[in-house]
Amino acid sequence: MAKNKKEKKPNKILDFLWRNKKQRAKNCLCLLMIFIVLVSVTLGFVSSKLELITVDSENNNTIVDASEANKIYEEEEFEIIQALESASSYNDFINKWANNGGELRKSKNVLNVLLVGVDGDDGLENGGRSDSIILVSLNKKTQKIYMTSFFRDTWTYMNIGGSDRYNKLNASFFHGGDDALIDTIEKNFKIDIDYYVAVDFSSFTDIINALGGVTLEVEEYEANYINRTTVHTIEHGPAVNLNGYEALVYARIRHSDSDSDVSRTRRQRKVISALIDSAKGAGVSQLNSALDMLFKYVKTDLTKMEILSYGTQALASGWINYDIEQVVLSDPDIFRTGYVGGASVVFVDFPIVAEKVQTAIYGDSNVVNDENSKRAFSHLTLGSDGHYRAR
């Protein structure tokens, strides 16, 4: 999680913003749709737009100097985290892994932002459901943006208000809000998260409609699902334009695939990528309308000056042109679907997944899995119904 640091005065940010306003406004607003995934940021219409964002008042993070936007730092060395060698049960395994004190992987060349799509009557506060959980990692060294989806149904250890609990990953947000969700992901996947951006899904359809929809590939069975379950009729094909409602239904399709949550998270990432493409091709007035809708439904621990600072860096360094790479965690060797009680869950081999995610984002990992490592799945039993249960 972001640490408290000594405050630094930003350098020449506002001068940079207001130079060549008209062209810069469009570039800055296009950047928003990268930052809906990255830091939910825009630089155009600075004063009025930033006032719409809900900012976490407890954040004391440092303003980043835009003059260092292109600087590549030497990588630090990290203490090795050995995978577990013993555990008495699956819950004991994930408890020991989360609380082993392993050093979280981080880099000055990587910005990690947790994007949380929230559903529910209580919206961005406790009580909302984190329906979509995506870690967006901007790596200046590789000049890529990595998107890692976490299954919301992952059965995991979490600490809520000082009490040990075992539940689905998204329950940490429901019971403890942003801090609990970030703490749970950091401890289980051994990655330091710099910031979070929570977006209320109630804004989703209006934002996409304001941008003229999103264009993406739709498989025949996906189109059939939407046509069967809604009053809308869409075609299938390599480039289908979906309006906001259709895109939302598409992103939530879950029971049309044998792998359930795996394909669901894949579709969520596709919609986000398509949203970025729509923003890049939109006019300033379209983007302005989208921002007015979006920012009322955004909560973040970025301060307004940090937003300006990172946005300035993004323009100066061409972050908007970085390739987006999906970090796919669908390897059947690293997860199992099953039940805890009557609830459908995803069991994850956390040491293996943590190593894979770290390697994808940073190019290496401080997690070591070897022949002596205890596998989490040795504590699962396969039932006659083909589903796993923890023991």
What are these regions, as identified by a protein language model?
Residues 2-35, 41-391:
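Non-catalytic, solvent-exposed segments at the cell envelope interface
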